[in-house]
Amino acid sequence: MQLHEQIANISVTFNDIPRSDHSMTPTELCYFDDFATTLVVDSVLNFTTHKMSKKRRYLYQDEYRTARTVMKTFREQRDWTNAIYGLLTLRSVSHFLSKLPPNKLFEFRDHIVRFLNMFILDSGYTIQECKRYSQEGHQGAKLVSTGVWSRGDKIERLSGVVCLLSSEDEDSILAQEGSDFSVMYSTRKRCSTLWLGPGAYINHDCRPTCEFVSHGSTAHIRVLRDMVPGDEITCFYGSEFFGPNNIDCECCTCEKNMNGAFSYLRGNENAEPIISEKKTKYELRSRS
């Protein structure tokens, strides 16, 4: 069967909420995620969001324009099949897929579907530009609620994809500056795990609205505090993620309480920011 026939078939036979298990290796997940964020997220936000391989170009300019058109149509018409087929038949994507075994075509397609869920009304959330964080040059992304959520709810169409990392994998993945956003330490498994997928866009807050719940090779998001449309979906990365006692934390709660990176504001409106000694890496965020 020719590749385009395979793409046509997998664009029809799919679940709009992909299975929670997967067989991706850490390297495959990095490439699949970079492609998915380029095709789906970047083409909507119109800037480059986080990437595991920052020097790689995934699409040519004409393909990027096509991806933007595909995503615009998807957001208007919610036609999953046309969106999947339109994205997977782009030259650069097809060339990448031609090197994969058949079972990995399904894995790649499912990863695209995870991100397409960001723009489905039923998902109850979406992605928006975020200019809060200096580590991102004040141009990043955030996930926000588009519906009403109650404590204990599971955000069904929002997930993270998890891969266990060997020490060799960890050294390779963390070699690139800024790629540590994607790595968490599992206290239960006592090892580092690669954390990508839509859930990787969840920002930290010291008073989070949600939490990560791990189950096997994925993690879902559970609501901790009631949310209404416009509320940001946030999780707690850890007490030392942004330096000792999160001294460099720039979250909304720290700004409100004048803690973390905003502690210089206490009692002195004219004070200058205190620049702590910067490390090349933040600490790994933790999960159970």
UniProtKB/Swiss-Prot annotation:
GO CC terms, sorted: chromosome; nucleus
Gene3D superfamilies, per the entry: Histone-lysine N-methyltransferase (1.10.10.1700), SET domain (2.170.270.10)
SET domain location: 128-238
Catalytic activity: N(6)-methyl-L-lysyl(20)-[histone H4] + S-adenosyl-L-methionine = N(6),N(6)-dimethyl-L-lysyl(20)-[histone H4] + S-adenosyl-L-homocysteine + H(+); N(6),N(6)-dimethyl-L-lysyl(20)-[histone H4] + S-adenosyl-L-methionine = N(6),N(6),N(6)-trimethyl-L-lysyl(20)-[histone H4] + S-adenosyl-L-homocysteine + H(+)
Enzyme class: transferase
Localization in the cell: Nucleus; Chromosome
Entry-linked SUPFAM superfamilies: SET domain (SSF82199)
GO biological process: determination of adult lifespan; methylation
Disruption phenotype: Mutant animals exhibit a lack of di- and trimethylation (H4K20me2/me3) and an increase of monomethylation of 'Lys-20' (H4K20me1) of histone H4 on autosomes, leading to equal H4K20me1 levels on autosomes relative to X chromosomes. Decreased expression of autosomal genes. Increase in 'Lys-16' acetylation of histone H4 (H4K16ac) on hermaphrodite X chromosomes. Increase in binding of the RNA Pol II large subunit ama-1 on X chromosome gene promoters relative to autosomes. In a dpy-21 mutant background, RNAi-mediated knockdown leads to embryonic lethality.
UniProtKB keywords: Chromatin regulator, Chromosome, Methyltransferase, Nucleus, Repressor, S-adenosyl-L-methionine, Transcription, Transcription regulation, Transferase
InterPro entries: Hist-Lys_N-MTase_N, SET_dom, SET_dom_sf, Suv4-20/Set9, Suv4-20_animal
Family to which the UniProt record says this protein belongs: Belongs to the class V-like SAM-binding methyltransferase superfamily. Histone-lysine methyltransferase family. Suvar4-20 subfamily.
Role, per record: Histone methyltransferase that specifically di- and trimethylates 'Lys-20' of histone H4 (H4K20me2/me3). H4 'Lys-20' trimethylation represents a specific tag for epigenetic transcriptional repression. Contributes to dosage compensation of X chromosome-relative to autosome-linked gene expression, possibly by converting H4K20me1 to H4K20m2/me3 on autosomes. Involved in the regulation of growth and body fat metabolism downstream of the TOR complex 2 pathway.
Record's protein name: Histone-lysine N-methyltransferase Suv4-20
Name of the encoding gene: set-4
